[in-house]
Design a protein with these regions (language model features):
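Inter-lobe coupling/hinge segments of SF2-like helicase ATPases
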Residues: 215-221, 225, 237-678, 686, ...
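Accessory, non-ATPase domains that flank or precede helicase/AAA+ motor cores in DNA-metabolism machines
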Residues: 1-380, 394-408, 691, 725-757
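Short amphipathic alpha-helical segments
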Residues: 14-16, 172, 663-665, 711-713
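Solvent-exposed, membrane-proximal periplasmic/extracellular interface segments of envelope transport
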Residues: 38, 55-60, 64-67, 702, ...
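A general secondary-structure junction signal
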Residues: 50-52, 100, 200-202, 453-455, ...
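A carboxyl-terminal module marker
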Residues: 686-711, 750
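Hydrophobic/aromatic-rich, well-ordered segments within soluble, folded domains that form packed cores
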Residues: 33-34, 80-83, 664-665, 669, ...
């Protein structure tokens, strides 16, 4: 008897053993999907991790069916799953759920997309018979038009005797109806007469049009060519290379040359981007060069599209290049040779909720290690502290590109003291006279402007002017955000909505006012100040669909809109030729965040947003509004002094035991009842301190201590580099299991965020 150990798509640790019925033994190998029973009535699609002959010491159920003829999971992918599960302290089931498209975990068989085609009946496929067909419908004008349109589209009208002059072209029913401007009833009438018939064909959901045109790749500038050569030299010695290039230095063009080299060596490339918005712009550039050798993969694609990409990657003709966001790291690669991680510093590479809370950069580096000779290139204008430190220490190769493409100057950054301007009553709401003048001039010159505010919604909150009442979420420990366009107060944590009240429920006053400012409110105010502007807003609310992203970027690129207002989405490497002015409305909101990474993240955000200004022959202008113009980080942004920031922060990190010198693990506890959550967190903290001593901080309330009715407490563990990470995880799991055995804590949830951002 043979047995399989399988992974279930459930948040459960380890694998589960089932027997293989007689007749199926030869069909099952690791990496295949099988249908298995669980409990009395449930069935799941499980992933085979191992096949063996070791009989378990319990009665195990047989698998119901084998769903694959070939493995859906490659050995390298499974090893990546194991590493993510172990390092990020999540179950294999969680990794399975995150990695595979839901269509491959559904008990319903995946249905390929079918298209209905129209064809000429065999009895009419000669010149004489066609005349008969046309005479049959000459009195029915709509049918006559539909038939002649079909004959033209399909090229049956080019008959000479019994043979068409050109090859017959397939015509879909939808195409015929559109071109002939007719209804389905007209086509059906032609079918009923026996002139036409319909048939179905499987069609891919993926855009496979376009041949590769590697000859269209632009030659590199001298600075780019030098960086390219250095990267290749570094990759001979190091598996990971960091390309530190200023904004608009032409890093993407270097990537394209590296991709071409990999393809010529018959290797595959994984190109990761932090935001789906970025894939739209980069996709257009890559598609012109690599055509149908390029595949796109991210969460805004339909599940069916993601299944088709997965299956194509397992075929004998996979994509040579995959361009995608975080989840693309899980795709199968048969001959991976190069991984490019663009904007490697971006926090959106880190998965937050649900588990596994993995970092795509770390996962991609680990994935590359599983292929012989695969290399990783990290690219950014503002490296993460960890990556730059690794490069300085010699763990990674380092290549620097310090000049912008075509010697375009870095933007002029003008720091505006809004505290002083407010005191002198010179501000117009949140806008300084310098900012308004710069935007006005840009619009007058036919140029574009970007305004950055890292908060969506109309206003962060509303408040009663009389008693100070602020509406709070009933499920979470946060105030509700005002969204004026839909006239709702919304919780950005659980999605709870509440109609905007007309009077204060606490004191009855009607004097309710918005406090703070979000992108939606800025859009309204700027429309009043610049009625001639064509304004677009880019935030989470306006980009919920793939088409919304593409439309926003396309409209701004083509000049249909000329003033873009947005959150951090607009900072992430988007290139717009006509942007001459960028306004950072409130630098202080990024700097005042209670987090040890606040200055690092604020510098990155401001430097990246500033980098959107100035393209093609004109120096850009950035208006940076702040109440604290003398802060060192403001000066570092103005002078683009990343090295100064790095040196200053590094000393603090070493002194206070933070990355890159220490690894952090956040331990979270959740429970419906606050007292139980508090008590459990103190007990767990005491247990962990017994093992790790002063490395354990807390328990404490996080900034938001209640989400979706669950109370939250947090412990932080600081682990010096070189400590046995696996031993630490064993201790943590042991402490968790012991605590959950206590009947008082049966409903307690414990989870981990490893290397939190």
């Amino acid at each position: 008897m043979r047995y399989v150990d399988v992974i279930l798509p459930l948040p459960l640790d380890g694998t589960f053993t089932y027997s293989i019925p007689a007749g199926m033994e030869e069909k099952v190998v690791p990496g295949m999907r099988v249908l298995v029973p669980l409990g009395k009535s449930k069935k799941y699609i499980a992933m085979v991790a191992d096949v063996h002959s070791e009989k378990p010491n319990f009665d195990c159920k047989p698998i119901d069916a084998v769903l694959d003829e070939c493995p859906s999971l490659l050995p390298q992918q499974y090893r990546l799953w194991q590493w993510i599960s172990s390092y990020y302290m999540s179950s294999l089931g969680d990794v399975y759920n995150a990695a595979m498209p839901s269509g491959m975990k559904s008990t319903e068989k995946f249905k390929p997309k079918m298209e209905l085609y129209v064809e000429l009946a065999s009895g009419f496929r000669n010149e004489q018979a066609l005349h008969v067909a046309l005479s049959m419908v000459q009195r029915a004008l709509k049918q006559s038009k539909a038939l002649t349109t079909f004959l033209t589209l399909s090229q049956w009208d080019s008959l000479e005797g019994d043979t068409p002059r050109e090859g017959i072209r397939k015509v879909t029913k939808e195409e015929l109806m559109n071109e002939a401007h007719c209804t389905a009833a007209v086509v059906k009438a032609l079918i009923d007469r026996g002139i036409l018939f319909t048939y179905e064909l499987e069609v891919g959901r993926l855009n496979t049009s376009g041949e590769a045109h590697l000859d269209l790749i632009k030659p590199l500038s001298m600075a780019q060519q030098d960086a390219y050569n250095q990267i290749l030299m570094q990759m001979m010695k190091k598996n990971v290379v960091l390309l530190h290039g200023v904004t608009s230095s032409g890093k993407t063009e270097i990537y394209i040359h590296l991709i071409r080299k990999a393809i010529e060596e018959h290797k595959q490339v994984l190109y990761l981007l932090p935001e789906i918005a970025l894939t739209v712009q980069i996709m257009e550039r890559l598609h012109k060069v690599f055509g149908d050798r390029l595949g796109i993969y991210h969460s805004k694609y339909s599940d069916a599209e993601r299944v088709e990409i997965w299956q194509k990657q397992l075929s004998d003709k996979p994509y040579d290049v995959i361009l995608g966001a975080r989840s693309a790291v899980f795709l199968p690669f048969q001959r991976l040779g190069l991984v490019i991680i663009d904007e490697e510093h971006e926090t959106s590479f880190k998965q937050q909720d649900p588990a596994p809370r993995y970092h795509a950069r770390s996962a991609a580096i680990m994935l590359a290690n599983m292929y012989a000779d695969a290399k990783v290139l990290l690219g950014t204008a503002t490296p993460s502290m960890e990556s730059y430190y690794n490069a300085q220490q010699g763990k990674y190769g380092l290549v620097e590109l310090k000049t912008r493409y075509k010697d375009i100057q870095l933007p002029e950054i003008q720091v505006v003291d809004v505290k002083d301007l407010r005191h002198r009553k010179m501000m117009t709401g949140a806008y300084s006279p310098q900012l308004l003048a710069a935007v006005r001039q840009a619009l007058k010159n036919g140029e574009q402007a970007i305004l950055f505010q890292n908060r969506r919604g109309f206003a962060p909150m509303i408040e009663c002017k009389v008693c100070g009442w602020v509406p709070k979420c009933k499920n979470c420990d946060v105030s509700l955000t005002l969204h004026k366009s839909i006239n709702l107060l919304t919780c950005h944590y659980c999605g709870y909505t509440y109609p905007v009240p007309t009077e204060c429920p606490n004191c009855g006053s009607t004097e309710l006012m918005g406090r703070g400012i979000g992108t939606e409110r800025i859009e309204d105010q700027i429309a009043e100040i610049f009625p001639e502007a064509r304004i677009a807003r880019m935030d989470l609310d306006t980009t919920r669909t793939r088409n919304a992203y593409e439309r926003l970027i396309s409209d701004f690129s083509s000049g249909k809109t000329n003033l873009l207002i947005g959150t951090q989405m607009i900072s992430k490497g988007l290139d717009f030729d006509k942007v001459s002015v960028v306004g950072i409305l409130n630098a202080d909101s990024m700097l005042s965040y209670p987090d040890f990474r606040a200055y690092e993240h604020a510098f990155m955000m401001m430097a990246q947003v500033s980098g959107r200004a100035g393209r093609k022959g004109k120096r850009g202008l950035v208006i940076l509004q702040t109440k604290n113009p003398t802060l060192p980080v403001i000066g570092q942004v103005v002078h683009n002094d990343y090295e100064g920031l790095f040196k200053g922060i590094l000393e603090e990190r070493k002194m206070f035991h933070y990355p890159p010198f220490f690894h952090l693990i956040n331990v979270f506890l959740k429970h419906k009842h606050e007292k139980i959550c508090q008590q459990a967190s103190f007990e767990l903290g005491k247990t962990l301190r017994g093992w790790f001593g002063e490395r354990v901080l807390g328990p404490d309330k996080p900034a938001v201590s209640r989400v979706k009715t669950m109370n939250i407490r947090k412990l932080v563990i600081k682990l010096e580099n070189g400590i046995d990470q696996m031993k630490v995880r064993e201790y943590l799991k042991y402490a968790q299991n012991m605590m959950l055995k206590d009947p008082r804590y049966g409903a307690l949830q414990i989870y981990y965020d490893v290397d939190p951002l």
